[in-house]
Amino acid sequence: MFFFKKNKNLKAFLTGELVSIDTVNDDVFSKKMMADGIAIKPNDDKIYSPCNGTVEVVFEGSEHAIGIVMDNGLQVMIHCGLNTVNLTGICSSKVKKGDKVKAGQLIMTFDREKLKEENCDDITMLVVLDQGKAKSITFVGDQNVVANETEIAQIA
């Protein structure tokens, strides 16, 4: 098994209220069927990269989710809103597959009003897809967070 030589921190990808992924009103996330992670109830409409890495995937059509492979090989996915997979014109990716991103770089915007009109929750999740590559991942507890400033997870 590969262990990282030094700790890596993930920064808040949105400004808002950080909550446990267990509280998300979607079993795929709350029951950690995809992976463990964290969620933010946003105060704004801009999503930033929580880490340095390479964009692995941008979901076509809806652009509601972006996967990033961190420079240390760990994969994270940011998923904007609930029940957004079939919606178009609400999320707008600012990156494409293969792009190198830096922590704090704007990677997506979304229309919060349109999400409300579609009766979709704008809570946004970050999941760590291949946690077995890390010795430990520690997510912080519920709190208000500021994008690019507040540490939300430490990976060892």
Q: Language-model segments: which ranges?
A:
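Contiguous, well-folded functional domains in the mature portion of proteins
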Residues: 1-156
